[in-house]
């Protein structure tokens, strides 16, 4: 969950003056001591017990009951992603009627569109990062705020904000955005989420009705997409999920979650198969599934998922390197890749593609380059995923990739949102966040990590 500290500027305001939070900024939540009123035109909308946000044109707030969820006993060298959570919502599952499409994908969904630079991440940069920076670095930070990055729907309480973003995109396009803007979101709320790690355990438990709750979460996303059929929207589906079923099935939580993961993702792919949508399922990275022992079973599994969902036309392919650090291409595989011949993402997708095609799926790919600007990295092992030292912002989002298999470079992981806490006493502490190649001290997953932002900015390649 996100837990922001107020800026120094707010703390210095005169006591007789009521501070107002900027649009998209935080205005409440557990531990929040900053402004609770929004600027004109905004309303403070509660997203969960830990976070409330100023949203334009909002009229009501969403209130949730919350309970503590999620424990695990095993850690592995897998990737993890932003947006852990501890909220749970009891809802009734209902499937909305609406159009679906079947058949083969029809071209690169990024072509002819600009990706959405979401105001939420921009507000983090402007209200959390820049106030403690000066000079040239602050100017560069302002440029980062304009880079498109995905919005993470990592708890059900955030789904209503999807409509706010889609409305914002619609307005931009009606105002003549050229090229038109595409919405970019991450669907990330599986029950028993992140089954082989601790840092990003989610809000739903399989043992507590998690499958039904997840389906209600997907129904709510579908409803938002149906309200905005004119907004082209691209989704990354469930980071750190199916890849665990290849390499970490020996972990009790993963073996116990296998059927639920497959059922839930099947439901998501079918329900979100809409004319204005393109989807990419997360497929780990080359250092995870690129090994000879893993890549064949991975191709078979992903192709089966595609076919079991009735070959949805909106399912374009796979997302790789999400929240990770791998190079797109590197001349020599570094020592920390330990002999893995598919050590970079270009090698990985070109090895995976023919296997997928032979299994019945002519898939394409996108790659997260938000934190891969420094190559080789300072990882001790390619599976080290938590707040790795020495990293930098990487290739900017673009559909100009120079590779027929790669639809786009994207920033899925918002740079400087922590991968996980380094506090060994925390309930969600994962040993990877205490490794010598992890930057410390680090806050909880999803919380703003100022030192990490400054590292990414200083080492950005290309530079800002």
UniProtKB/Swiss-Prot annotation:
Domain CBM1: 20-55
Keywords, alphabetical: Carbohydrate metabolism, Cellulose degradation, Disulfide bond, Glycosidase, Hydrolase, Polysaccharide degradation, Secreted, Signal
Annotated localization: Secreted
BP terms from Gene Ontology: cellulose catabolic process
Catalytic residues, chain numbering: 194, 240, 419
UniProt-annotated stretches for the region Disordered: 65-108
Name of the protein: Probable 1,4-beta-D-glucan cellobiohydrolase C
GO molecular-function term, one example from the UniProt record: cellulose 1,4-beta-cellobiosidase activity
The EC number(s) this enzyme carries: 3.2.1.91
Chief place of localization: secreted
Pfam family, one: Glyco_hydro_6
Organism encoding this protein: Aspergillus clavatus (strain ATCC 1007 / CBS 513.65 / DSM 816 / NCTC 3887 / NRRL 1 / QM 1276 / 107)
Cysteine pairings via disulfide bonds: 27-44, 38-54, 195-254, 386-433
Catalyses which reaction(s): Hydrolysis of (1->4)-beta-D-glucosidic linkages in cellulose and cellotetraose, releasing cellobiose from the non-reducing ends of the chains
Coiled coil (residue ranges): none
Its job: The biological conversion of cellulose to glucose generally requires three types of hydrolytic enzymes: (1) Endoglucanases which cut internal beta-1,4-glucosidic bonds; (2) Exocellobiohydrolases that cut the disaccharide cellobiose from the non-reducing end of the cellulose polymer chain; (3) Beta-1,4-glucosidases which hydrolyze the cellobiose and other short cello-oligosaccharides to glucose.
Superkingdom of the organism of origin: Eukaryota
Family the entry assigns: Belongs to the glycosyl hydrolase 6 (cellulase B) family.
């Amino acid at each position: 969950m996100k837990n922001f500290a107020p800026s120094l500027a707010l703390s210095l305001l005169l006591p007789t003056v009521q501070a107002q939070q900027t649009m998209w900024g935080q205005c409440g939540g557990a531990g929040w001591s900053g402004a609770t009123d929004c600027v004109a035109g905004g309303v403070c909308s509660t997203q969960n017990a830990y976070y409330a946000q100023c949203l334009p044109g909002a009229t009501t707030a969403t209130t949730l009951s919350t309970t503590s969820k999620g424990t695990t006993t095993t850690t592995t060298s897998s990737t993890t992603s932003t947006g852990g959570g501890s909220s749970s919502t009891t809802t009734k599952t209902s499937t909305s009627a609406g159009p679906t499409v079947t058949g083969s994908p029809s071209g690169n969904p990024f072509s002819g569109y600009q990706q959405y630079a979401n105001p939420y991440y921009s507000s983090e940069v402007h209200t959390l990062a820049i106030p403690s920076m000066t000079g040239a670095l602050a100017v560069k930070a302002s440029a980062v705020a304009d880079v498109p990055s995905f919005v993470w729907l990592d708890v059900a309480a955030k789904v209503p904000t999807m409509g706010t973003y889609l409305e914002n995109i619609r307005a931009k396009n009606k105002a003549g955005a050229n090229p038109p803007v595409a919405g970019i979101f991450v669907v990330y709320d599986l029950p028993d989420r992140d089954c082989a790690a601790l840092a990003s355990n989610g809000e739903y438990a399989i043992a507590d009705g998690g499958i039904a709750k997840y389906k209600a979460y997907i129904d709510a996303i579908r409803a938002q997409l149906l309200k905005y059929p004119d907004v082209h929207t691209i989704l990354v589906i469930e980071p750190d999920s199916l890849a665990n079923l290849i390499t970490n099935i020996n972990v009790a939580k993963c073996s116990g979650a296998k059927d639920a993961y497959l059922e839930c993702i099947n439901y998501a792919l079918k329900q979100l198969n809409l004319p204005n949508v393109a989807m990419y399922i997360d497929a780990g990275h080359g250092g995870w599934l690129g090994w000879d022992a893993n890549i064949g079973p991975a191709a078979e599994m992903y192709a089966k998922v595609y076919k079991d969902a009735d070959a949805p036309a909106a399912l374009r392919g796979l997302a790789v390197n999400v929240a990770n650090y791998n190079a797109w291409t590197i001349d020599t595989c570094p020592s920390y890749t330990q002999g893995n011949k598919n050590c970079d993402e270009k090698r990985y997708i070109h090895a995976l593609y023919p296997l997928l095609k032979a299994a019945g799926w002519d898939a394409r790919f996108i790659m997260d380059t938000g934190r891969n600007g420094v190559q080789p990295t300072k990882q001790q092992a390619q599976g080290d995923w938590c707040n790795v030292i020495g990293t930098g912002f990487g290739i900017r989002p673009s559909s100009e990739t120079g590779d027929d298999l790669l639809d786009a470079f994207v920033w899925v992981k918002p740079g400087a949102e922590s991968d996980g806490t380094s506090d060994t006493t925390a309930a969600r502490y994962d040993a990877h966040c205490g490794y010598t190649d992890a930057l410390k001290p680090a806050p909880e997953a999803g919380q703003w990590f100022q030192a990490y932002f400054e590292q990414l900015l200083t080492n950005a390649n290309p530079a800002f």
